[in-house]
UniProtKB/Swiss-Prot annotation:
Expressed by the skin glands. GO terms for cellular component: extracellular region. It comes from Lithobates clamitans (Green frog). Its main location: secreted. InterPro entries: Antimicrobial_frog_2 (IPR012521). The keyword Nucleotide-binding does not apply. Belongs to the frog skin active peptide (FSAP) family. Ranatuerin subfamily. It is found in: Secreted. This is Ranatuerin-2Ca. The keyword Secreted applies. Antibacterial activity against Gram-positive bacterium S.aureus and Gram-negative bacterium E.coli. Has activity against C.albicans.
């Protein structure tokens, strides 16, 4: 349903941001 899809989308967003932050810590952030 719509709610589940929205939840999945939000989870993907959060996971993506966490991954980006992790990459920054490991490899160093480049603007």
């Amino acid at each position: 349903g719509l709610f589940l899809d929205t939840l999945k989308g939000a989870a993907k967003d959060v996971a993506g941001k966490l991954l980006e932050g992790l990459k920054c810590k490991i490899a160093g952030c480049k603007p």
